């Protein structure tokens, strides 16, 4: 009996000690949990304030263009050299043809501008040469027709008519000298700077060069196609031989 009572006392003591330890642990954990709750609450309030103040904006991903995919199949060295030569030849031919086309366009544009300028000068010269003679003839007819009618009326008109008859062709020397100088200047010539035959002769080698380049590019394409056909036939024969040797 005494031993049983002793065992019961030790068990009760152990239970009381365990209970005290649990209480101490719970007391220590309570401030940590409360501190975490307060920190979470402060962060939540800050997030709410920022959500209210800062508006949402569109996100710029700054995505660049995708990678340039290359061929996974490695061509043979002979094909690599042929393809590189074809690419370089095509690029050179394209650059040369572009330059020739630009020069042709600039030449045709210059020819059109010169022709238009020449026509304008011709029209201006025709207008300038036709209008003064017409006005002078009208004035002379008016004076000749009006003089006999008013010959006995006004002596001043008679004197003016006499002076005009005496002056004759020297009535307006300054205007005529200016007009003659304008017609003698090289800028008033109505002929174009270059004749159509010269322009055609300048454009003939350009056209021949373009045709030659087109012919070269066509021959190069045909050679490339023939080489590709030969390569395809050789590959096919190789596959057939492999199948024959592999079959029992």
From Swiss-Prot:
Keywords from the named record: Cell cycle, Cell division, Mitosis, Nucleus, Phosphoprotein, Repeat, Ubl conjugation
Keyword presence, Nucleus: yes
Coiled coil regions, renumbered to chain: none
PTM-bearing positions, type Phosphoserine: 11, 16, 129, 131, 199, 201
Gene Ontology, cellular component aspect: nucleolus; nucleoplasm
Name by which UniProt lists this protein: Protein PIMREG
Entry comment describing in which tissues the protein is expressed: Expressed in thymus (at protein level). Detected in spleen, colon, ovary and small intestines.
Renumbered ranges of motif D-box 2: 53-56
GO biological process: cell division
Quaternary structure (record): Isoform 1 and isoform 2 interact with PICALM; this interaction may target PICALM to the nucleus. During mitosis, associates with HDAC2 and MTA2 subunits of the chromatin-remodeling NuRD complex; this association is strongest at prometaphase and decreases as the cell progresses through metaphase and anaphase.
UniProt biased composition (Polar residues): 1-10, 132-143, 186-198
Localization per record: Nucleus; Nucleus, Nucleolus
PTM per Swiss-Prot/TrEMBL: Ubiquitinated by the anaphase-promoting complex/cyclosome (APC/C) complex in the presence of FZR1, leading to its degradation by the proteasome during mitotic exit. However, degradation is not essential for normal mitotic progression within a single cell cycle.
Sequence segments annotated as region (Disordered): 1-32, 117-205
Stated role: During mitosis, may play a role in the control of metaphase-to-anaphase transition.
Motif D-box 1: positions: 14-17
Entry remark concerning the domains of this protein: The N-terminal destruction box 2 (D-box 2) is required for APC/C ubiquitination and proteasomal degradation.
Annotated InterPro entries: RCS1
KW Cell inner membrane (keyword) present: no
